[in-house]
Design a protein with these regions (language model features):
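Secondary-structure end/capping motifs
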Residues: 229-306
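Pocket-lining segment of extracytoplasmic ligand-binding domains
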Residues: 87, 168-260
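Sec/Tat signal peptide C-region and signal peptidase I cleavage site
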Residues: 19-25
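Bacterial N-terminal signal peptides
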Residues: 8-18
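Positively charged n-region of N-terminal signal peptides that target proteins for export
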Residues: 1-6
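Short, glycine-/small- and polar/acidic-enriched structural segments
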Residues: 26-163, 172-175, 179-185, 199
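Conserved C-terminal helix/tail region of periplasmic/extracytoplasmic solute-binding proteins
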Residues: 295-328
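Short, solvent-exposed loop/beta-turn-alpha elements that line the ligand-binding surface or hinge
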Residues: 49, 53, 203-214, 280-289
Length: 328
C-alpha cells in the first residue's frame, strides 16, 4: 500500500511539473492605447515579455482610442490599464470607480516652438497670437494653458488656440497657419526639415509652476481594486517588469526602434526618432513627489472646468510600487 501511495504521489508531482509555465503563472488582462505615445512603452513591454519574465501570464488588450483602457477598466473588462491618461485615471477614481492608481508611466513632455524666422522671441510675446496645442480637455492642454497663465501672465483670452493632434499641429506650423505650437520632442525630431526655435520647455516650466522636481505626468497605470486586493504580488511584479522595461528601453534604443517599426509600421527614421526620445518621455515611478504632481495637475484641470470632484487619497496606492522596488 505504501509503495502504491508513493507511486501515485510521484505521478502527481511529475504531472504538476509538466504543466506549461503559462498555466501556472498569474493571469492578468492589461490594456493600452496603441495609437499614441504610450505605444512605445507598451510595445516594448509586450514584445520583450518583461511581465512574463516575472511569472505573469498577460493577455494584452489593445485599444485604438486614448480613453479605451480607462473605459475598459471601469467595466472591469481588464485588470490593469497601462499608460492610461492621468487626468482620466483620477477622474474615474473621483467618480467612485473602484480603481487604484499605482504608477506614473509617462511624462507630459512638450516644447513651445516657433518657426526659426519668426519675430516672436519669447513666450511672453505670444499675446494676441494663435497657438497650436492639444484640444481642450486633454492633460497637455490644461498644463500648457496653466503655464502660460501662471508663468507668463497670458490669460486664455490673450491668445487663440488652434486644437489638433501632433501631425496636424506640425503641419499648421510649417504652413504658417499658427504663430507657435506646443509639440512633443518626438514630433520635432520627425520634422527636422522644418527649422524651428524653442521658446520654452513644458517640463521645466511645470517645475517652476509646481515648485517641485517631479515632471507633469501624462499617463499612469491603474488597477481594478478587487484584482489588486486578490493579487497584490502580481501587481507588484507587473510594476517591477515596467521598471525593468524602462531601463531596457533607455539602454537599447536601436532595438526599441526595431520594435516600433514592426508594431506601428513606422519608417526606420521615424522609429529611431521616436526611440531616441525614450528618456524624456517615460518613467516608472510613484514617489510622493509624483503623487503631488498628479494632484496639482488635477487641481488645474478642475480650475479649467474639466472636473468637479477630487480623487480620494485612497486612490493613490503606493504599496505595489514599494514592493516592486524590492523585486529584481
Amino acid at each position: 500500500m505504501k509503495i502504491t501511495k508513493l507511486i501515485v504521489a510521484a505521478y502527481v508531482l511529475a504531472m504538476a511539473l509538466s504543466v506549461p509555465d503559462p498555466l501556472l503563472a498569474q493571469k492578468m488582462k492589461v490594456g493600452y492605447w496603441t495609437s499614441g505615445f504610450s505605444l512605445g512603452f507598451g510595445s516594448v513591454m509586450e514584445q520583450m515579455k518583461f511581465a512574463e519574465s516575472q511569472g505573469l501570464n498577460v493577455e494584452w488588450v489593445k485599444f485604438a482610442v486614448v480613453n479605451g483602457p480607462t473605459r475598459a477598466i471601469v467595466s472591469n473588462a481588464i485588470d490593469i490599464a497601462f499608460a492610461a491618461p492621468s487626468t482620466n485615471s483620477m477622474g474615474i477614481a473621483a467618480d467612485g470607480v473602484p480603481v487604484k492608481i499605482v504608477l506614473a508611466t509617462q511624462i507630459a513632455e512638450a516644447q513651445i516652438v516657433v518657426l526659426d524666422g519668426s519675430p516672436i522671441k519669447a513666450v511672453g510675446d505670444l499675446k494676441g497670437k494663435k497657438i497650436g496645442m492639444s484640444p481642450a480637455g486633454s492633460a497637455t492642454h490644461a498644463i500648457a494653458t496653466a503655464i502660460l497663465d501662471h508663468n507668463f501672465g497670458l490669460k486664455p483670452s490673450d491668445y487663440s488656440v488652434a486644437p489638433g493632434n501632433e501631425a496636424q499641429l506640425a503641419q499648421f506650423l510649417s504652413q504658417k497657419e499658427i504663430d507657435a505650437g506646443v509639440l512633443r520632442s518626438v514630433t520635432l525630431a520627425q520634422i527636422e526639415e522644418t527649422k524651428l526655435r524653442r521658446l520654452g520647455s513644458i517640463v521645466d516650466e511645470w517645475k517652476k509652476l509646481s515648485k517641485g522636481n517631479a515632471p507633469p505626468i501624462l499617463a499612469t497605470t491603474i488597477v481594478y481594486s478587487d484584482y489588486l486586493t486578490k493579487n497584490p504580488d502580481a501587481v507588484a511584479k507587473f510594476i517591477a517588469a515596467t521598471r525593468n522595461a524602462l531601463q531596457y528601453g533607455s539602454k537599447n534604443k536601436p532595438r526599441v526602434g526595431e520594435i516600433l517599426q514592426k508594431a506601428a509600421n513606422m519608417t526606420a527614421a521615424d522609429a529611431r526618432a521616436y526611440a531616441n526620445q525614450w528618456d524624456g518621455a517615460y518613467i516608472a515611478s510613484f514617489e510622493p513627489a509624483d503623487i503631488a504632481s498628479l494632484k496639482k495637475m488635477y487641481d488645474i484641470v478642475k480650475a479649467a472646468g474639466g472636473a468637479t470632484k477630487d480623487a480620494p487619497d485612497s486612490a493613490f496606492d503606493t504599496g505595489p510600487y514599494t514592493r516592486a522596488k524590492k523585486i529584481n
